[in-house]
Structures are given as structure tokens and as C-alpha cells.
Amino acid sequence: MQILVRDNNVDQALRALKKKLQREGVYREMKLRRHFEKPSEKRAREKAAAVRRARKLERKRQERDGAK
């Protein structure tokens, strides 16, 4: 990954780098790989995330359909 430093402005370049890393999901990946995760824990985490996504989608549908 490459960030250009313009006009010797390192702070702005660091902010751009952090934003890029955040968008790419590097921080999330680092957090997940910090410790070994058992396959059963991984399945449970992924299932919980799927349930959260489904609930969120259903809430959005209810809001959209209820507004009509």
C-alpha cells in the first residue's frame, strides 16, 4: 500500500493511510488474527453476524413497507 506525502505534510498522509487501511479491513483482520480462534468459535461468530445482518435487513424492510 502506498501513500504519497505532499508538501511534507506527514499528518495528512497518516490520516489517509489509516482511512485506506480501515476501508480495506486490515484492522478487523488484525484483530481476528491476534489470537487463534477455534473453528467452533469461528462458526458461532459468523452465525451471530448472519443473524444480526438478517435482523437489520428485516428492520429496514419493515421501515420501508410501514412508511408506504
UniProtKB/Swiss-Prot annotation:
Protein's name in the database: Small ribosomal subunit protein bS21
Cellular component GO terms, alphabetical: ribonucleoprotein complex; ribosome
Keyword Protein transport: no
Family statement drawn from the similarity comment of this UniProt entry: Belongs to the bacterial ribosomal protein bS21 family.
InterPro entries, alphabetized: Ribosomal_bS21 (IPR001911), Ribosomal_bS21_CS (IPR018278), Ribosomal_bS21_sf (IPR038380)
GO BP, sorted A to Z: translation
Species this protein is from: Novosphingobium aromaticivorans (strain ATCC 700278 / DSM 12444 / CCUG 56034 / CIP 105152 / NBRC 16084 / F199)
UniProt region (Disordered), positions on chain: 37-68
An MF annotation (GO) of this entry: structural constituent of ribosome
Basic and acidic residues bias (residue ranges): 37-49
PANTHER family reported for this sequence: MITOCHONDRIAL 28S RIBOSOMAL PROTEIN S21, SMALL RIBOSOMAL SUBUNIT PROTEIN BS21M
Biased composition (Basic residues): 50-59
Keyword list, A-Z: Ribonucleoprotein, Ribosomal protein
Pfam families on file: Ribosomal_S21 (PF01165)
